[in-house]
Amino acid sequence: MFKLAIILALLFFGARAGAVRDGYPILSDGCKYTCKPLGENQNCSRICKEKAGSWYGYCYMWACYCTDVSKKAVLFGDSGTPECHVWIK
């Protein structure tokens, strides 16, 4: 039973370490890239590719959201990023 618990813990922590990172890329002021229309969006796909090293992006809640971003990408909410103080851009 103890061995099973160790194996499950290793699998869990291993999966977290290699977890795919998704999120909102940000402008230099810490704000998200706004978009419309919602859903498939060529502008968001371009932003995600250029700013986050992502292969796919779409417009979600009026902001560009990127999937499977590079480890170097800076995303909204990352520590050390500026806080956005603008409600509408």
Swiss-Prot record:
Domains: entry comment: Has the structural arrangement of an alpha-helix connected to antiparallel beta-sheets by disulfide bonds (CS-alpha/beta).
UniProt keywords, alphabetically: Disulfide bond, Ion channel impairing toxin, Neurotoxin, Secreted, Signal, Toxin, Voltage-gated sodium channel impairing toxin
Lineage: Eukaryota, Metazoa, Ecdysozoa, Arthropoda, Chelicerata
GO biological process entries: defense response
GO MF annotations, alphabetized: sodium channel inhibitor activity; toxin activity
Chief location category: secreted
The LCN-type CS-alpha/beta domain, residue ranges: 21-85
Protein name, per record: Putative sodium channel toxin Ts30
Pfam families for this protein: Toxin_3 (PF00537)
Tissues expressed in: Expressed by the venom gland.
GO cellular component: extracellular region
SUPFAM superfamilies, sorted: Scorpion toxin-like (SSF57095)
Residues spanning the signal sequence: 1-17
Cysteines paired by S-S bonds: C31-C84, C35-C59, C44-C64, C48-C66
Localization (cell): Secreted
CDD domains in UniProt: neurotoxins_LC_scorpion
PROSITE patterns the UniProt entry points to: LCN_CSAB (PS51863)
